[in-house]
Amino acid sequence: MSEGESKSTHFGYKTVEADKKADLVAGVFHSVAAKYDIMNDVMSFGIHRFWKRYTIEVSGARPGMKVLDLAGGTGDLTAKFSHLVGDKGEVVLADINDSMLKVGRTKLRDRGIVSNVSYVQANAEALPFPDNHFDIITIAFGLRNVTDKDAALRSMNRVLKPGGKLLVLEFSKPQHEVMRKVYDLYSFKVLPKMGQLITKDADSYEYLAESIRMHPDQDTLKQMMVDAGFEQVDYTNMTDGIVALHRGYKF
């Protein structure tokens, strides 16, 4: 690349300058933040709750642990972790988008979840936390929106304690042809219409469908985690691989 030539990346199916993607993604989530929880229930038929519940179970969170819920949005995982780690533990809900953070903070405070939760606006590619700080890091439905996923994974590895665990819950690739066809039809024909009806924003849900297709598949993401320094990396497919939970450790 010649001097002065900017790097490019994808925003859905569009090719954009890498330094512009974060602002474009921010626009999506500023637009949908207020109706984010409702839309999650509608577009997944409530199944996202099962995916998140399984993630919590796999985390092994215990009293006294420090947990980073990265790209934590409206706080579904944070609420569960807050209960599990107790008063001697700590949960940090971090998100790059201030609109999502505001919704999450309001929701959790309205539910009385205040004593062990803090909120940080942070970029996953350069986390503002000390080395070896967290016992558990989760990033649920956030990694595909990150511009430099390799940098983000390395940053997560840095702030994770030795013996700590990273859990990446993300949309992935269906394993069977029939499911792929049904999923494509739903994603590109139905989902944007739902977005328009509920959030008055079809474009953001077109981006969602496209961003899922551009995200690395299960085995590629597994190798990316290994390359970032994680060990014993594996994954579990859910709903035929529409979603996968990747797990890796720092030793």
UniProtKB/Swiss-Prot annotation:
- Which amino acids does the record list as binding S-adenosyl-L-methionine? T74, D95, N123, A124
Q: Which reaction equation describes what this protein catalyses? A: a 2-demethylmenaquinol + S-adenosyl-L-methionine = a menaquinol + S-adenosyl-L-homocysteine + H(+); a 2-methoxy-6-(all-trans-polyprenyl)benzene-1,4-diol + S-adenosyl-L-methionine = a 5-methoxy-2-methyl-3-(all-trans-polyprenyl)benzene-1,4-diol + S-adenosyl-L-homocysteine + H(+)
Biological process, per Gene Ontology: aerobic respiration; menaquinone biosynthetic process; methylation; ubiquinone biosynthetic process
Give the EC class as a word.
transferase
Q: Does the keyword Transferase apply?
A: yes
The organism's superkingdom is given as Bacteria
Pathway field of the UniProt record reads:
Quinol/quinone metabolism; menaquinone biosynthesis; menaquinol from 1,4-dihydroxy-2-naphthoate: step 2/2; Cofactor biosynthesis; ubiquinone biosynthesis
Which is one Pfam family of this protein? Ubie_methyltran
Q: Which UniProt keywords apply?
A: Menaquinone biosynthesis, Methyltransferase, S-adenosyl-L-methionine, Transferase, Ubiquinone biosynthesis
Which GO terms fall under molecular function for this chain's record? 2-methoxy-6-polyprenyl-1,4-benzoquinol methyltransferase activity; demethylmenaquinone methyltransferase activity
Enzyme nomenclature, EC number: 2.1.1.163, 2.1.1.201
Query: InterPro entries, alphabetically?
Result: SAM-dependent_MTases_sf (IPR029063), UbiE/COQ5_MeTrFase (IPR004033), UbiE/COQ5_MeTrFase_CS (IPR023576)
Name the family: Belongs to the class I-like SAM-binding methyltransferase superfamily. MenG/UbiE family.
Function statement: Methyltransferase required for the conversion of demethylmenaquinol (DMKH2) to menaquinol (MKH2) and the conversion of 2-polyprenyl-6-methoxy-1,4-benzoquinol (DDMQH2) to 2-polyprenyl-3-methyl-6-methoxy-1,4-benzoquinol (DMQH2).
Protein name listed in UniProt: Ubiquinone/menaquinone biosynthesis C-methyltransferase UbiE
Q: Which organism is it from?
A: Shewanella oneidensis (strain ATCC 700550 / JCM 31522 / CIP 106686 / LMG 19005 / NCIMB 14063 / MR-1)
